[in-house]
A protein has these predicted regions:
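Acidic, Ser/Thr/Pro
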Residues: 1-288
Length: 288
């Protein structure tokens, strides 16, 4: 973090440099926007095809065909979930939280998309409903459904705790779920686990030090975050050991609850919709 007492004095024009107005890195005016009216209309008459209950401090995989919908639902009590997404037939194409953040901001809500990694960079899923959209940003700068945290993991925990071995961090939970789904050894599956969408987690950055903070999630039973799959998806969801993340994670101390994944089949895809195609960049990189 930035020092309270810098070692180097500001130059004479320092205040002028700091006063330069910022610009948005990735203006999204030219980005194709989802037709939310068509997406939501496609839900009429849908059928619930699959339910997957994710136990506390565990993770489970689920599949969603392109054009179908899925919800992550709070069922028994406030609970945060860590979500990984993959192309169903290619573990190498996975959610890219950094680019999603650059395009849509630190926290996602209705109309935002989860984008896949390079060289694919295409929409994987679109948020179609968010029952916590009322929360906005609070007085601390916190909001829900962030793409700034990475996921709790046993490596960071071991460093911070003097070597404690905890096996139910979200990273480990997701590793086990991916390993079981694909029949991979844990060390091979782990390489595919990636930075997450922190579903229901309330987070931000402190204004004085710029540190990542968490606070009690406002989620309550019945709340959900809903998506439409833009491609055939494999999802992996961990019910975080931090519970509502009001105090700590990476231990068994917090009260934890299950999360429910529901997968819905619409009668027909949204009008005018087609699955995400390949990114239009030719991948030549200027190399002869």
């Amino acid at each position: 973090m930035k020092p309270d007492h810098p070692e180097h004095p500001a130059p004479p024009d320092g205040p002028a440099r700091k006063a330069v107005a910022p610009v948005i890195c990735y203006p999204v005016d030219g980005l194709p926007r989802p037709d939310l009216v068509a997406y939501r209309s496609a839900r009429d008459g849908w059928t619930l095809e699959t339910e997957v209950l994710v136990p506390p401090r565990e993770a489970r995989c689920f599949t969603v065909p392109a054009g179908w919908f899925f919800r992550i639902v709070s069922v028994d009590g406030p609970q945060v979930g860590d979500l990984n997404l993959f192309a169903a037939d290619n573990l190498g194409e996975r959610f890219f939280s950094g680019k999603t953040r650059a395009l849509h901001g630190t926290h996602l809500s209705t109309g935002d998309r989860m984008w896949s990694c390079l060289p694919y960079l295409r929409p994987m899923a679109t948020v179609t409903e968010d029952t916590l959209d009322w929360y906005g940003f609070d007085a601390f700068g916190g909001s829900v459904h962030d793409v700034i945290g990475t996921r709790c993991d046993p490596y960071t925990h071991a460093l911070l705790s003097g070597g404690d071995q905890y096996h139910h961090c979200c990273h480990s939970n997701l590793t086990r779920a991916v390993a079981d789904h694909w029949g991979l050894p844990a060390k091979a599956a782990e390489l595919h686990v990636h930075d997450v969408l922190n579903v229901f987690m309330c987070t931000g950055f402190t204004r004085d030090t710029g540190q990542y903070f968490m606070k009690a999630s406002p989620v309550r039973p019945g709340d959900y975050l809903e998506f439409m799959a833009e491609i055939d998806l494999l999802g992996a969801l961990s019910a975080c050991p931090g519970g509502d993340c009001s105090a700590e994670h990476s231990s068994d101390l917090a009260a934890c609850h299950p999360l429910l994944v529901q997968v819905f089949k619409p009668p027909a895809p949204p009008v005018g919709w087609a699955p995400s195609g390949p990114n239009p960049y030719d991948r030549s990189h200027g190399h002869e």
